[in-house]
Amino acid sequence: MASRFQEASLVTSPSYPNAVAWSSENLIAVAAGHLVIIINPALPAGPRGLITIPDAEPYQIGRVRSQEFWINNISDDVFVDLLTGGLLPSSLKRERHPCARSLSWSDIGMSPNHGCLLAVCTAEGRVKLYRPPYSDFCAEWIEIVDVSKMLYENLSSMNFGESNSPSTSSSKDQHHHEEDERISSLKTRKRRKTSANNINLQEKNYTDRASCSKQDSQAEHNVLEIEVYKQASNGQDCHYLPKASKKFSEEISPETYVSREALLSSLSVAWSSLLRFSSGSSCENMLRFSLLAIGSKSGSVSIWKVHAPECYHIERSDLSPFVELTAIIQAHSSWVSTMSWGISGCDSSNLKMVLVTGSCDGSVKIWMSNKEDLQKSVEVYKSSFFLLKQVVALNPVQVSTLSFVISNHYNAMHLAIGKGSGSFEVWKCELSTRKIEQIVSTNAHNHVVTGLAWSYDGRCLYSCSQDNYVRNWILCENTISEVPIPANTPGLNSTTDFPDDFLSCLGVALSPGNLAVALVRSFNVELLNPMYQARSQKAAVEFLWNGAQQSGESEDSSEMVTEAILGFSKNEFAYWETNFLWSLKEFKDLNKPLVLWDMIAAMLAFKQSMPEFVELVLTKWLSVSYLGFHADIPMEDLVPKISKRFSAVPSRLLHILNVISRRVMLSELKTEEVNRKLQGQRMNNEEEIDLWLKLLEESERELRERLVGLSFSAYLIAESSQGTVSPSTWNWRPAGLAQLQQWVEINHDIVPSQLETLSSEVKSSLIRSSNSTEARLEEEKCPYCTSPVNFQSAEEAFCESPHQKKKKSKDKERHDQSHKLERCCVSMQVCPPTPLWFCKCCSRMTLKLAPETLFALPSFPSDLKSLPESSFSKVATKPFCLFCGILLQRKQPEFLLSASPV
């Protein structure tokens, strides 16, 4: 049995499959009954976030008159008919307790603080969006959008697309599913298609589309479009459909009531990645949004565009994201139980969005949209998705879960389909030919498959089931085989008194670096101590290491590891080394947020027991990344070689190096102590620490030089374009030019000559601008006593308090009499006493954000003045740390939840 390295107990138990999700900013959400519990995997027993599922009032969709009799002693406003038309399940479901059914994290950058949004679908069919309480100082997450309410308003404004004639308002007879679809039963029942294809959303057929020669031409489907409404005042397109002018108090048939309720009853949610499109020649017209898919009981999937904020902040804000309904796809004839998104295309010019949907009728379909259609869809509200292929036809066994990944290793799409019978299928689709073939179908479990998760670019697959088994599979070419989950765990710190009496496993999720696995399990309460454990431990989240898994790679281990050590075999060391290097290589992608928590935690665990293995992995990564080849030389000889290459490597590599230096190789030192050593003297008797301190110092100086150069270049370009081009408020404008110039003067002997030249040009330009704001801000004031502050360091400052003039003494006493101030790590200006951006790795504060160009630089620019003006166009500047590259956040008290990228 695999050994967990940490765990987190839950006070409530999950009830549905796919109960756990891992966000791209390193937070874990668990749908546990009437609560959604958010956990920081770096502090599993620490503070948590909560979402309490509220009771939902039924929507006013109509009244049903009894077809045979009128019940006496009931008010005239009540019409009942529970035994006809399928109304009995609709009535019974309102008596159930609130419960979270499905959840999905958005991509990073959707929250106002550049974090992730969480979409939650309840058992009552309601979908809402939540943001973290970054400025509210509470544990409860903040609801920002009620998507179900928006859907109700849109549909009710059109009378649900039904004809006004009473003779045509009735629908066909229907079968239904058992409403209580909890994991304890999970039975599949037949159900006919709901009459949702006549919504007043224009219907269109895409059966033989010329742009997709390989799509399934036999399976017809309906894509429902949103109509464009005109405002009476200015005639422009309105972003929202008109609201209903009346409540639905008319009498309707039971069949119509069930049909309307099925349209509004959501079952599953899925976020796409954050998409970026330029709608014009200027970056000011950049479109940034994510697609939110919501599956319903009617078999339809509604596609919503949720636009990202134009700017990010950490102050309190009541602004909600702009959300628009773009299309409703009649995807299946029964409940849409699960969905998954993917992106096909190596670059933005050939981007294709892929949506896979699974239904309780056993069918699975693949939908696709081109980039041009997505951009057009934003403007004219037309659906851009067409049916690419029906992978699985109607089947009596329902689809319980999906996992979909587009593998760059195989240049193919890998689709895993979990079913209620305990089996799962793996399908492969070639991107070039769009040929879809089934690789395997296996009876992996005895009960319903409750979770599937791909790892290592589609080479490994995890499956879990209600039978409490978790299995690991390796995909090699067109075959899949099961491999055992390694029992050896580096740095095992799991508590021994944690019970192992689990009943079922209800979800599996992978960390951003793929090195850790999270499992959510329900306890068998009857086997727990009724006095203590049974009261507070209904379920648990287990964490397993995934680094020792075979990933299909055939790399040989380094010669240094020649025998088993500390219970690890030579092959396990080889797998760890391969997976470490794979994860580090993946983070070179600028579109992937720099979240290194799992890698840092694993390296620290190995460092305690086998530090030479960590040094071996880092030596190989540093030599390959910085020198271009594997240099099998000692670390003390390698460091001088790579430090000379800093100006020729991308900024992302420098950020990864800084994080590893601080959190792994200098982990014995506190962050404040590391910062002090970077500015002052070091101990000569700590050779290894001095080696990494020197490497960290030179890497951070390289990043600061790039920032200073970009700041000077942006200012000069903006000054030269005045009078010829209208000034744009969207361009990034540098701050603290006076402080940046002083830093260049202090470090004139080590900075590149190009920076000295630019600094002199900026100084001359500021002198010519008599009304320049930068010139007036050359002398800074203390925000507490208004005393002058001189520039002596880029990290901190001391004001010249009037008290210190009365007493000329040592520097220490002088500093005691003055205020110690922090400087912004970007502008080097004195930070005001207001909420600031905070880095969890280097503990620096940031007032002004660095330009996005800095994080994408492939090397130090040879000619900063030749950079195009578009390099400084503001496309929602991302709050990333200048030195670490991780997401900045507002500093929270220790008793409140916050994400830990490292």
Model-derived features with residue positions:
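C-terminal scaffolding/assembly regions of large eukaryotic complex subunits
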Residues: 2-13, 19-20, 26-27, 524-902
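Short C-terminal beta-strands that terminate individual repeats in beta-propeller domains
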Residues: 8-11, 50-51, 92-94, 257-260, ...
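Structural hallmark of WD40 beta-propellers
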Residues: 25-29, 111-119, 278-282, 286-293, ...
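Canonical WD40 repeat/beta-propeller blade segments in eukaryotic WD-repeat proteins
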Residues: 11-20, 96-110, 152-168, 172, ...
